[in-house]
C-alpha cells in the first residue's frame, strides 16, 4: 500500500490542508503539503488529537458552553417618554468530565504517594547508614582510645614495678650489711632478726599488690570515660546526620473557594434562579437565591477548613491567601532620573516616598515648598542626594539634539549667495515706494492707507546681481517686526526723508541695526523736493553714530528719489559693494534651514508661512520643523505667486502643509523623520507651557495690597483677529501698552484668519469686543454677534484701531470731581423761625448764593459744618439766587448753631471727564 500525501489525507477527512499541517506541527511532526504520511504518523496525530478525550468513550473531557440571555430595560428619556433598550448578557462556562478528572487525580495521588514512599525509604536508608557510620566511627575511636590508655597503664605499671624492685634490692642490700654487722656484734639476737625480715617481706608484698590494684582501677576509669565520650559524639553526629533536610520554600497556590465542586454547583443553581427571576419579574425567587448564596458560602467555608485540615495532616503548607509584603529592613537607594524641571509630587514618586517626606527634607534644608511646586534641576538634585538616592541628570532637549544632528547638511564647499537687505525707516519716508521702483511694481497701493503693515520679502534680479529685500513697517507698533527683520538681514538700508529728517522710528532702526551688528547704507529719499536738506540729515544721523564717508565715517550715503528714480542704480551698486566686502557665502546642497518671516491662515490653503532660506536647498515634499509646528511641504510659491519646486539660500518662499500657523521669527529646519518632528514639536509645546506656568508668581506679601486693589480696576476685554501673524503681534503689543492702573486691557483671544463662531461665542461669554484687522466674520459668527449684541469693529489701518480703543478706555475711566466756590455770605444776625429753626441773616460778600446747593459753615476760617442750603429768602419772598452785595435769609438744613460772624460758603461739584493720553 502506497503512503498518501498530506493533501490527499486532508481531502479524505474533509479538513483544510493548512489546519492539518498545523496539527502535524503541534504533534511534533514537520510536514508540507506534498509530503507523504505513514500509518504510524497517522496514529501519532490521532493520539495527540485525542489527548483531551476519554479514551474509553471517545468523549471530550472538557466542554465549553456559551449562554446568551436577552432582555429589555425601560430607560426614561427626554420629555417624559421612556424608551426600551435591548440587553444581551453573554456567559461562557466550562464543564469538566469528573470521572476523567477523578481518575487522573487518583493516578496523580498514587504517583505522588509512590514518590513519597520512595522518598521516605531513601531517607530512612540514608538515616540508617548515617547512624551505622557514626556508631562504627565511635566504636573505633573508643577502641583506639582504650588501647592507648591500656598501653599507657601497662608502661606506667612496668616503670613502678621496676622502681619497687630497685628499692627492694637496695633495702635488701642494706639489710644484708646490717645483718653482717649484727652477726659480728651480737650473735645471740639472730632469731629476732629473722622475724623482722619476714615482717618486712610481707609489707613489701602488700605494697606491691595495692599498687597494681590502683593501676587497674585507674585504667578501667579512663576506659569508661573514653567510651562515654565516644557515645556522646555518636549521638550528636547521629542527630545532625539524621536531621531531615529543609525543603525549599515554595509559593503557596492561591486557593479560591469558587474552584471547588460544591461551590460551582451552588453558583450554577444561583445563576439559574437569577435568570428565572428575570423572566418572571425578579420578585418571587429573590429570597431563595439569597439563601442559596448563604448555603454556598457556608459550603465554601467548610471546604476551605477541610482543605486546611488535610494540609495539616499531610504536613503541607496551608494554601490560604496571605499578604506577601514585607517591610524592607534597610533603606532602598534608587537611581532618580531628574529633568530640567520636576514637581515635588513627581520627585517623591520617583524616590518611592511620601510627598510630605520630601517637603520635610526641604524645610530642614531651608526651603519652603508645596506638593505641586515645580523645582529646578539643581534643587531637586540636592533634595534627592540629601535623602540618600543617586541622581541621574537628563537633558530635556535630548530628542531635539538627536533630530538636529541627524541632518544632511551637505559636504560641498560654500558658494556665494545673494545679500538679504532690510529696508527700514520712519513711517511715510518712502521705504515701500523705493522698493516698488526697484521691483517696477505697485506694492504700496495694495497696502491699506499706503503704509506697510507686514513684512514683505522679495527676490530681485538686477543687471549687477541678485538681492533679497525685506520691507518692514515703520509704524511705532511694529517694533518686534523691525527687530526680527534686523536679525535675519545682512545689510540694512536706512531710508530717511530729506525734508523730514531723523524721526523716532529712524532712531529705533539704528538701534536694531547696531544690536544685530549689521552694516548700514543710508538712502536719503525725496531728494527731488524743494524742502530737501541732505546735510541736515547727515548732521542728525552723526549724533547717533552714523557718519558719512565724506566726513570720515564708514557709512555710505546715497541720494535717491523713489518717485523719479534718481540714484537707484547707485544705491544698488552700494548694496552689492557692501555685500562683496562681507563675502556672504552659504552651503547650497543638503537639508535646508531658514527663518519664518511671516505667517498667516488662508481659508482655502490652510496655514501659510513665508520662509527665508539661510542655507541648503528647500524642496517640495521636505519635512519641515518650525517652532511648535511641523509638516510636509505640499506646495511652494515665490513672491510672484508662481509654483516652484526648490529654493536655494537667500530665497524667500511661501510654503503650505504645516500643522498650524507658526510664530514669525521661528527657525525652520528640514528633518528626516516626520514622527520625530512631531515629537519634538509636542515637546516644545509642553516646555513652553511649563515655562509659562513657572513664571506665574504666587500672591506674596509685597503684592497683597495690589491684588486687593485689582477688584476696583475696570477691564476691557478684546478678541483680536488679523490677517497675518506679525500684524497680530504688533497690535497686541500696542494694545497692552495702553493699560493703566485704572483700566486694564485684556486680550482674551487672538489669532490669524477670519472671525469664526468660536470667536463670537468667546466674546459673548466674556463681554468682549471683537476687533477684525483686514478680516471679516463668517455667516455663523455674524448670527451669534447679532443675537448676543456683541460689539464688532473692522479696521484696515492701525492708527484708527489704536485711537478708537483709547476712546473706549477713556469712557471707562472714573471721572474727576472738582469743587468750585460759587459765593460767600457773612452772618450779620440770627433769627428764630418756627419752621426752619435758626435762620441766618446774611450779606452776600462774594459771588452768588443759589438754593439747594451744598454749603459749608466757617467759623474763624475753620469748617465746622457741611450740609445743604434749605431755605433762601429775600425779605419775605423765596428766591432761587441772591447776587453779590444783597441781603438774604439763609436756613441751613439740620443745623441750628449759627452765630453772628460766621461765614457761609456755597459751592458746587463739577465732573471732569478724563482721557488716556
UniProtKB/Swiss-Prot annotation:
Stretch list, region G1: 425-432
Example of a GO cellular component annotation carried by this entry: cytosol
Major localization listed first in the record, in broad terms: cytoplasm
Location of region: G2: 450-454
Entry's localization field: Cytoplasm
UniProt-listed NCBIfam families: IF-2, small_GTP
Record keywords: Cytoplasm, GTP-binding, Initiation factor, Nucleotide-binding, Protein biosynthesis
Chain spans, region G3: 471-474
One Gene Ontology term of the molecular function aspect: guanosine tetraphosphate binding
Organism this protein belongs to: Proteus vulgaris
Keyword Methyltransferase: no
Annotated GTP binding sites: 425-432, 471-475, 525-528
Gene encoding the protein: infB
Function: One of the essential components for the initiation of protein synthesis. Protects formylmethionyl-tRNA from spontaneous hydrolysis and promotes its binding to the 30S ribosomal subunits. Also involved in the hydrolysis of GTP during the formation of the 70S ribosomal complex.
Protein name: Translation initiation factor IF-2
Keyword Protein biosynthesis in annotation: yes
Disulfide topology: none
G5: annotated span: 561-563
Annotated stretches, region: Disordered: 102-326
UniProt xrefs under PANTHER family: TR-TYPE G DOMAIN-CONTAINING PROTEIN (PTHR43381:SF5), TRANSLATION INITIATION FACTOR IF-2-RELATED (PTHR43381)
Chain intervals with Basic and acidic residues compositional bias: 102-249, 294-306
Stretches assigned to the tr-type G domain: 416-585
Family: Belongs to the TRAFAC class translation factor GTPase superfamily. Classic translation factor GTPase family. IF-2 subfamily.
Sequence ranges of Basic residues compositional bias: 279-293
